């Protein structure tokens, strides 16, 4: 996951699925972004669905409206946006930046393990 991809069609589906899986907040979910630094790739360009609310909004209106507001209007593409909004009820997020070094990755997954124990 990269912040530059935030709000693309895959995210719309992913966030809607997570909302469904929590049963409206009855179940807890831990979201591990495996967030890496932005780069020059254009993988996050698939946001045209946000310009077609008649086709896409009906599947999960709160998620669609949230992403349209943040991506199209505010031009704000950061996973932190969804974390602070509370759109995925009863969710905990592991959003530390994941780097390539072996020691850093071991630390990353150790921290993730601690979060699962909570």
Regions found by a protein language model. Give the residues of each.
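Class I S-adenosyl-L-methionine-dependent methyltransferase catalytic core
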Residues: 1-118
């Amino acid at each position: 996951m990269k912040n530059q991809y935030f709000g693309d069609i895959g995210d719309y589906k992913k966030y809607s699925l997570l909302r469904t899986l929590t049963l409206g907040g009855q179940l807890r979910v831990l979201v591990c972004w495996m967030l890496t630094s932005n780069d020059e790739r254009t993988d996050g360009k698939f946001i045209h669905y946000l310009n077609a609310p008649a086709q896409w909004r009906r599947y999960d209106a709160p998620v669609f409206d949230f992403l349209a507001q943040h991506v199209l209007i505010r031009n704000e593409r950061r996973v932190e946006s969804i974390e602070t909004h509370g759109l995925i009820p009863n969710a905990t997020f592991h959003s530390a930046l994941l780097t390539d070094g072996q020691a850093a990755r071991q630390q990353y997954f150790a921290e993730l393990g601690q979060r699962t124990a909570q």
